[in-house]
Amino acid sequence: MVQSAPASEIAALILRGFDDYREQFREITDGARARFEQAQWQEAQRASTQRINLYEEKVAETVAGLRVGLADSELLDVERWPIIKSAYIAQIDLRLDDELAETWFNSIFCGLFSHDNISDGTMFVHTTRPSLRAHARAPYTRTYRPGGDLRQALEKIFDDYRFDVPYDDRERDLERIDALLHSNLPDWVCKDPDLAIELIGSVFYRNKGAYLVGRLFTPDEQWPLVFPLLHREGHGIQFDTVITDEAEVSIIFSFTRSYFMVDVPVPAELVAFLKRLLPGKHLAELYTSIGFYKQGKSEFYRALINHLATTDDRFVMAPGVRGMVMSVFTLPGFNTVFKIIKDRFNPSKSVDHATVIQKYQLVKNHDRVGRLADTQQFADFRFPVSKFEPECLAELLEVAPSTVVMEGDVVLIRHCWTERRMTPLNIYLENASEAQTREALNDYGLAIKQLAAANIFPGDMLLKNFGVTRHGRVVFYDYDEICYLTEVNFRYIPEPRFPEDEMSSEPWYSVGPNDVFPEEFPRFLFVDLNQRRLFAKLHGNLYDAKYWQGLQEQIREGKVIDVFPYRRQETPEQLLG
């Protein structure tokens, strides 16, 4: 029944919806340990998708409940919302996840009002929380002090983090991890009587792996520390390796990875701890990496508006070949690209606007195996005209007039995606040395293979559609033709019927909409003959339809293929049942 309600009651209803979301988020997350112990890999993938979709589902549910229970005159009077916001601040003040609660409030407000009502008076454009309140106390961690006996500390770690499934070979792993630490670190570190190991109490789960995350430190220095664990079905839990290199740990927390499942009692504390381990990571990326992608979006937006307010940076078109479906622009001093859908596509493209949006959602929900860039979707961005280079603004208005609109001295962008900026692979190769070319082309082939192992076919595999990250990894970022590998029909080109067939400009065989002929890849992918020959040596099996058909068969049999986010001795394409 629609009834009158004070601001505090509306705030309480919003917070009740948040509590429901957080409870279900924790429930899904808490199941990660059992899924790991029971080797339920497909269930883990489903849980990941379920948790991603949960936020929008619960926002919609809360908005619908407010509309049913409250009169429009109360709920949709925007002038009341500063009072509702004040009441809400009082109610979340003692919470341990208050920054997430602020973002939830913003989502509810945007579900009720158009974006032109957004202001810091009606919602949390800027946070009211103290900056990284986590400085008040340390996150839940376990600390070990080897006192010169690293092996004994490792034994205690193995005991403290044991699972309900036994270790495959505890002694073997202890010896190997001890040896790796002595190999990775300066000799004096392992002997330092003041050396300490600090590990986050909660285990990080993702796909088929579990990770212990923390640091090694002395009074003067620190190193990040990650122990990846695997469950070898039929054998037990295995400490796979140890990682102490900041760049390698950064890759594990990369924007190209799926989100971790980890118990996070106080999000700000955990993010502050991770920030100390990985100072090059932005808060947005760290929040996103542990599953709070909406909080990551809030942190990104705040960083963006602060950058625009404090610098003379102006939007320009992104370097590289212009896209047939998307138009891409960037801020030179802000490590992000902004992607909008063009009003009209190149005639060779068979997709429409709705299909493009579906493709981006597919990427959001799917295991990105370190080879697909994560994106954030935004609606109704407003920027001053003065923040655009004239050539950039003119091009955007020309190619996407339904999306980019002038409102006086403000540019309205109705819909866009943001994505980490990378160097397009084709541009990278233009300036690469022989060794860099070989490494990049090898990683390009691995990217295609690892995506295929995750049941993803990029569609358009041209070099320009892949980027190179600051760590030198090759990542796919053009999603308008992406699809599930199992939807593709990989074929061999039939033998010509007559000699004249090979000279014809038209194929002598029928071609279905999902047909792909890997034999055609070399001439489509590489203009440079040296690159073409090198890639054939590195990944020539990609030109064979049988290779792709074999992967499809394994995927249809329900096999989940290992793709590791760190270097190891075994092949990254190893199959496990």
From Swiss-Prot:
Cited InterPro entries: AceK_kinase (IPR046855), AceK_regulatory (IPR046854), Isocitrate_DH_AceK (IPR010452)
Function recorded in the entry: Bifunctional enzyme which can phosphorylate or dephosphorylate isocitrate dehydrogenase (IDH) on a specific serine residue. This is a regulatory mechanism which enables bacteria to bypass the Krebs cycle via the glyoxylate shunt in response to the source of carbon. When bacteria are grown on glucose, IDH is fully active and unphosphorylated, but when grown on acetate or ethanol, the activity of IDH declines drastically concomitant with its phosphorylation.
Catalytic activity annotation: L-seryl-[isocitrate dehydrogenase] + ATP = O-phospho-L-seryl-[isocitrate dehydrogenase] + ADP + H(+)
Pfam families attached to this UniProt entry: AceK_kinase, AceK_regulatory
Sequence similarity: Belongs to the AceK family.
Name of protein: Isocitrate dehydrogenase kinase/phosphatase
Active site: 374
Location within or outside the cell: Cytoplasm
Residue positions binding ATP: 318-324, 339
EC number: 2.7.11.5, 3.1.3.-
Keywords: ATP-binding, Cytoplasm, Glyoxylate bypass, Hydrolase, Kinase, Nucleotide-binding, Protein phosphatase, Serine/threonine-protein kinase, Transferase, Tricarboxylic acid cycle
